[in-house]
């Protein structure tokens, strides 16, 4: 099957990869966690070991560095935070146009839920997954799942 036979989403995915991801304290800029791993791969459940102190931060700055062969007209992410399979939070991020054959860094800020809604790390540990759907407009590129462990 040639690339002309592939659907748009599959064609983008074939030339797409996440190079690294960094989470920072949004107030201080201090790096809390970083990983050089392609979290966009849809065929496996990924794991991330994140310091427990991330749960006490007011906001987290997330940087995603990615490369793409194909142009994307409206690159965006939909993320669902699930606890034991039930949606706790849902976030929507839009980057917009991405040029072909480029490497890009995308920074987003995620504010914490109110303290009254937070659960302890020992309850969350291993029971939280983040389901990320990568889109170009309405075309699904990939859906990945990352299970969180707090250390």
Swiss-Prot record:
GO biological process: sensory perception of light stimulus
Cross-referenced Gene3D superfamilies: GMP phosphodiesterase, delta subunit
Pfam families: GMP_PDE_delta
Cellular component annotations (GO), alphabetically ordered: cytoplasm; nucleus
Domain of life: Eukaryota
Localization in the cell: Nucleus; Cytoplasm
Record keywords, A-Z: cGMP, Cytoplasm, Nucleus
Family according to the record: Belongs to the PDE6D/unc-119 family.
Subunit structure, interactors included: Interacts with Pde6.
Name of the molecule in the record: Probable cGMP 3',5'-cyclic phosphodiesterase subunit delta
Organism name: Anopheles gambiae (African malaria mosquito)
């Amino acid at each position: 099957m040639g690339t002309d036979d592939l659907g748009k989403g599959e064609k983008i995915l074939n030339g797409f990869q996440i190079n690294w991801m960094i989470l920072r304290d949004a107030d201080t800029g201090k790096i809390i966690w970083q990983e050089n791993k392609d979290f966009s791969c849809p065929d496996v459940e990924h794991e991330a070991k994140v310091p427990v102190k991330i749960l006490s931060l007011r906001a987290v700055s997330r940087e995603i560095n990615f490369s793409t062969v194909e142009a994307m007209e409206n690159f965006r992410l939909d993320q669902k935070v699930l606890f034991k399979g039930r949606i706790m939070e849902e976030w929507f991020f839009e980057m917009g146009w991405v040029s072909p054959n480029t490497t890009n860094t995308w920074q987003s800020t995620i504010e914490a839920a109110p303290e009254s809604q937070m659960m302890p790390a020992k309850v969350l540990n291993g029971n939280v997954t983040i389901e990320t759907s990568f889109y170009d407009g309405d075309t699904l590129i990939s859906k990945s799942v990352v299970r969180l462990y707090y250390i």
